[in-house]
Amino acid sequence: MKKLPNKSLIALALLSVSGASFGHGYVSAYENGVAEGRATLCRVPANDTNEKNTNCGGIEYEPQSVEGPDGFPETGPRDGKIASAENSLAAALDEQTADRWVKRPIQSGNQHFEWNFTANHITKDWKYYITKADWNPNQPLARDSFDLNPFCVVDGGMVKPPMRVSHLCNVPEREGYQVILAVWDVGDTAASFYNVIDVKFDGDSPVLPDWNQGGQIYPSQDLNVGDSVYTRVFGQNGENVSYSTELVIDSEELGAANNWSHALATKINQEQTMLQAGQLNAEGVISPIYGTNPIYLKQGSGLKNVEIDYKINSTAPEYDLEVYGLESEYIIGDSATQLDLTLEATGDIKTEMTVYNHHHESLSSHSAELSDGQVEAATMTLSKSEPGHHMLVVVVKDQQGKVIEQNTLDFHLIEEQTPPPSGEYDFVFPEGLNTYTAGTKVLASDGAVYQCKEFPFSGYCTQWSPSATQFEPGKGSHWSEAWNKVN
């Protein structure tokens, strides 16, 4: 195994960095989107009720990465794996019951669907499907669950869209809980992005006269004895502390997330007349549960919304992991490709590291338990070595197995070449990518030298990323539009 010179030391500060550089896009509701996608609500709460999906696995940290094979419905993800797009990172999204996921309100007729991109690929089209009127919400999502005639198709024109787009679509009439499948067909790869959206059509929800939802108690963390959790209630003139309710954690049992959520909701109902907390049943009765409890505000009270805050008296432990030694490129040799890494821990942690190729195949894994300050070597040998983009996914957990953070580092495997003399080219592609202009010469991965074409084609020379390689010299599907081969 041969390695190129290490250009930079790669350190991963997992508590301060989130998201992956190769991620792409997700259904959002930042501006005028009618509803957030299932994966999006794993990462951020709903913009009006603060409801959030839980127990989502690794996709919580990368909602933009629900990527899978294209061609739906003829090909694409298998039945039962549609929500995850067969991406192991998103496997939890395939769970399907009537009450598993947060549902966003919607009406039939014209609605806007919004996509937010972290990498705006050349696009073939977007398609939107909806479940059949008689679908079974307690069975895994399959092709038979959906009306396979998309109710909305938006042409992408084989160009890059803006970083945020909105599509006006005519949503068919439905009742109750339905799932909308939004498919973004990327034009420069053999992949598509699949976002399912859990929606509830108006007219079937329990009605509570004179009350509106203004927030929720979301049991996001366990608390320790001495900590407290309290409501912050806001009206038209700002926060009104007279409506605040505080729960002090006086036992380890009460500190469990679902327990304090139930206890706080119960205390709100005992102390307040303008606020009520709990799940609303079909009879219009609000009852606290051991889980997420919506908070309702009395109409005419002047109250607008409720937030949950904490007073943490215990010192929260610090967790951090640094990963050193990952090269940006590895040359494929006669022996198996090997990553020689060094791990340094802050706090007592568990780490799970997995190497994937761009097709999401797992090639190597490594697990370790590290104590505070421990430095340990880690060697990962890949099961196969093929040229192209690869990813090292690092997951850090505390000693109880709770995920602290996840991040992804990119690297490439390249074939060994005998390069021409360095005087014949300006850069080894993709070094100096942003500086390429007409006439720039680069040494490509096939060992040949290519020269950037004159305007107006020179703009294509800088359009490259590990997941968008259509203009890569000598390799991409459209490389000849940007480059001339010199030798």
Swiss-Prot record:
User: SUPFAM superfamilies from the xrefs?
Assistant: E set domains
Q: Does the keyword Transmembrane helix apply?
A: no
Mind telling me which GO cellular component terms the entry cites?
A: extracellular region
Give a Pfam family name: LPMO_10
Keywords per UniProt: Chitin-binding, Secreted, Signal
Q: Which residues form the Chitin-binding type-3 domain?
A: 438-479
Indicate where this protein resides in the cell. Answer: Secreted
Q: Could you tell me the superkingdom of the organism this chain comes from? A: Bacteria
Keyword check for Transmembrane, yes or no. Answer: no
Q: What is this protein called?
A: GlcNAc-binding protein A
Q: Could you tell me which species this protein originates from? A: Vibrio campbellii (strain ATCC BAA-1116)
